[in-house]
């Protein structure tokens, strides 16, 4: 099994962590989708990462589909509840965390443009998306929808999203007034799977 992606992608990191937590052996193929000579399109015609390539050569994309495929392999520990509705609730929170990653990626791309071409309105929109979503996640931790000691698909996605914000210095004050969220990500960052997938220093 091969995972095609970039070491800096939070979506790729989420899937690497799922595989590591389940003890599933895989080969990592480092491809930078924004490089002109990248080989991603041979695995995904959209040219996007991550892509999971099975032993039979079947290619799975994108991130939520791959996460579901990994879970369907029925390798312990389970990262989704057995109950379909509870599982869908976890997937909803995963989608929220993935949205934070998307907003972070858009912010990074916007800030990479020449200063005169950057849109402050666009950056503000993305910051607002991130902050609203982080507030909702903090609320889930306060009301018990999420717990700080839980390891599942949703909490892994949340920690990968926050890890990306830290890595790219997007929303630098995210931890202010969100103590439960801080506790959750600290617990997850201490796990071996997170240590092994930490993005390389610039």
Curated annotation (Swiss-Prot):
UniProt xrefs under InterPro entries: Glutathione-S-Trfase_C-like (IPR010987), Glutathione-S-Trfase_C_sf (IPR036282), Glutathione_S-Trfase_N (IPR004045), GST_C (IPR004046), Thioredoxin-like_sf (IPR036249)
Residues of the signal peptide: none
Top-level division of the source organism's lineage: Bacteria
Positions of the GST C-terminal domain: 83-202
NCBIfam families: PRK10357.1
PANTHER family assigned: MALEYLACETOACETATE ISOMERASE
Family that this chain belongs to: Belongs to the GST superfamily. HSP26 family.
Protein name, UniProt field: Uncharacterized GST-like protein YibF
């Amino acid at each position: 099994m091969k995972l095609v992606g970039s070491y800096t992608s939070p979506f790729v990191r989420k899937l690497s962590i799922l595989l590591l937590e389940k003890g599933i052996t895989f080969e990592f193929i480092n491809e930078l989708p924004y490089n002109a000579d990248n080989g991603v399109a041979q695995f995904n015609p959209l040219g996007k990462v991550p892509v999971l390539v099975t032993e039979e050569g079947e290619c799975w994309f994108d991130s939520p589909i791959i996460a579901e495929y990994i879970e369907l392999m029925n390798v312990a520990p389970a990262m989704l509840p057995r109950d379909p509705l509870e599982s869908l609730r976890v997937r909803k929170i995963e989608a929220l965390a993935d949205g934070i990653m998307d907003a972070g990626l858009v912010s990074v791309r916007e800030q990479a443009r020449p200063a005169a071409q950057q849109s402050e309105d666009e950056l503000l929109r993305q910051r607002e998306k991130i902050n609203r979503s982080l507030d909702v996640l903090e609320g889930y931790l306060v009301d018990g929808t999420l717990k700080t000691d839980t390891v599942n698909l949703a909490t892994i996605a949340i920690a990968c999203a926050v890890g990306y914000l830290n890595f790219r210095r997007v929303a630098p004050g995210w931890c202010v007034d969100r103590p439960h969220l801080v506790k959750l990500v600290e617990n997850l960052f201490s796990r071996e799977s997170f240590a092994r997938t930490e993005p390389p220093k610039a």
